[in-house]
């Protein structure tokens, strides 16, 4: 979400009543908007809800502090102290960005502790992406400044730089040692595997669960919980890979990648067809059948604001809505299937906004994934996915499906509003503004309509 807290992405939080929650967990370091996370946490705390913030320190919350600077210092220290590299260069993230600057400071501190002089030429910027990182290395090669070791501010850049140097005939780690940061899965499929530092997801999950259990058993108390990234030893730094930490199955990974790619292509075609059919609907009541024709939208519910089905409302107009308002259940795959099994038809209906989704208690034990629906910056509602089992491909398709619904529903709203306006213009053109009676044009049209209605009985 951007810094405008009324944006479509953030406005969805006004549509969901949080009072049913036992604990609210905000992944604040992923929002990219500290002020919004702070306001959200404050609202939930005022409601008496325990709040856990992941990544950012927020007052009166249980804050998980991800000590990324300390973690980056660990990987730099490994390069300097263990391997003895002194001719070392850093490819940072975005210039002036907080996390990038934090890692630069960690880099400088480690060099200072080991009496290695630092100057600004020892830092390049790769914007956390592959191409800028490779461009930075090309510049070093062109200027004949290729160092003995390169530490990258994230794994994406480290893998890209490793591949590029290898393609140029420069051995990693024999000629240039490389490290990354974050600990993403890709580092294990690189050749050589890339050394890194990161907080293991399982470690993170265990700590969060422990914090939640503590709230239930001992009560809520705001505090800061530090989590430190762990060193991940692989081959790109000059070490042997820690095979015991994670075994990489190249065959399984390749098959999964191919399945993602081809399934993505096939599903995009299906979703495009669904989008076309939705926008050809005469009303929102017809949409559910079109969405369920293809067996792609299962285990999901789509709830929109009631004014979205009102053709007279301008689709570009932002109307403030709260969870106490009525919401419109546009689609419910489970209900559709149930009614179909007994020969009935699903009919969209209004629902109390405080219910969030129909039959919510029936999904106890499932992970509910909510995503905002918006079009041209105007919030429309949300979808809720409630898969009963963990099949990765189900989760991969969520962004595709939501993007399709955003465009299809937004497009339909525009078309229906245009149809409404045309009818109003036509209606105005038939009526005399002074008397309210048909004018000549309106009378002739109405007369012709009456004749058509009479058919062969007309005189």
Predicted regions and their residues:
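Amphipathic alpha-helical "output/dimerization" segments
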Residues: 390-410, 419-423
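Conserved nucleotide-binding and Mg2+-coordinating catalytic segments in signaling enzymes
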Residues: 424-446
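A short, aliphatic-rich beta-strand micro-motif
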Residues: 358, 365-374
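Alpha-helical recognition/docking segments in bacterial nutrient-uptake
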Residues: 1-77, 142, 156-158
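Signal-transmission linkers at sensory-effector interfaces
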Residues: 240-280, 421-427
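Active-site-proximal structural segments of metal-dependent nucleotidyl cyclase/transferase enzymes
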Residues: 446-459
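Flexible loop/turn connectors
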Residues: 138-242
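Hydrophobic alpha-helical segments within soluble ligand-binding/sensing domains
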Residues: 59-90, 101-109, 130-138, 158, ...
């Amino acid at each position: 979400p951007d810094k405008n807290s009324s944006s479509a992405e953030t406005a969805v939080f006004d549509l969901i009543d949080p009072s049913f929650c036992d604990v609210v967990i905000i992944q604040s370091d992923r929002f990219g908007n500290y002020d919004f996370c702070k306001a959200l946490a404050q609202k939930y705390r005022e409601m008496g809800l325990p709040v856990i913030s992941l990544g950012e320190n927020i007052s009166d919350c249980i804050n998980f502090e991800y000590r990324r600077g300390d973690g980056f210092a660990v990987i730099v220290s490994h390069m300097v102290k263990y391997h003895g590299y002194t001719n070392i260069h850093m490819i940072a993230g975005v210039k002036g960005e907080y996390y990038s600057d934090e890692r630069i400071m960690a880099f400088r501190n480690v060099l200072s502790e080991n009496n290695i002089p630092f100057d600004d030429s020892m830092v390049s910027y790769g914007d956390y992406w592959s191409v800028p990182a490779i461009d930075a290395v090309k510049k070093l090669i062109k200027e004949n400044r290729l160092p003995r070791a390169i530490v990258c501010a994230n794994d994406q850049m480290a893998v890209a730089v490793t591949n590029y140097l290898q393609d140029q005939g420069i051995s990693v780690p024999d000629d240039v040692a490389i490290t990354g940061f974050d600990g993403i899965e890709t580092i294990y499929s690189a050749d050589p595997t890339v050394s890194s530092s990161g907080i293991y997801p399982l470690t993170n999950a265990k700590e969060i669960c422990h914090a939640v259990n503590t709230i239930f058993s001992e009560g809520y108390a705001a505090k800061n919980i530090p989590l430190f990234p762990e060193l991940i030893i692989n081959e790109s730094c000059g070490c042997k890979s820690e095979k015991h930490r994670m075994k990489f199955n190249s065959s399984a990974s390749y098959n999964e990648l191919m399945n993602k790619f081809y399934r993505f292509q096939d599903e995009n075609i299906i979703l495009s067809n669904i989008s076309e059919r939705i926008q050809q609907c005469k009303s929102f009541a017809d949409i559910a059948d079109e969405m369920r024709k293809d067996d792609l939208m299962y285990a999901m519910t789509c709830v929109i604001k009631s004014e979205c089905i009102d053709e007279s409302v301008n689709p570009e107009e932002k109307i403030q809505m709260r969870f106490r308002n009525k919401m419109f259940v546009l689609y419910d795959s489970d209900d559709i299937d149930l009614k179909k099994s007994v020969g009935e038809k699903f009919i969209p209906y209004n629902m109390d906004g405080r219910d969030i989704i129909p039959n919510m208690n029936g999904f106890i034990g499932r992970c509910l994934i909510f995503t905002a629906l918006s079009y041209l910056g105007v919030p429309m509602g949300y979808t809720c996915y409630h898969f009963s089992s963990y099949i990765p491909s189900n989760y991969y398709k969520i962004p595709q499906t939501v993007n399709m619904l955003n465009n299809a529903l937004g497009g339909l709203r525009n078309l229906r509003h245009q149809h409404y306006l045309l009818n109003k213009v036509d209606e105005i053109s038939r009526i005399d503004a002074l008397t309210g009676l048909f004018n000549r044009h309106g009378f002739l049209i109405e007369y012709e309509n009456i004749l058509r209605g009479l058919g062969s009985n007309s005189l």
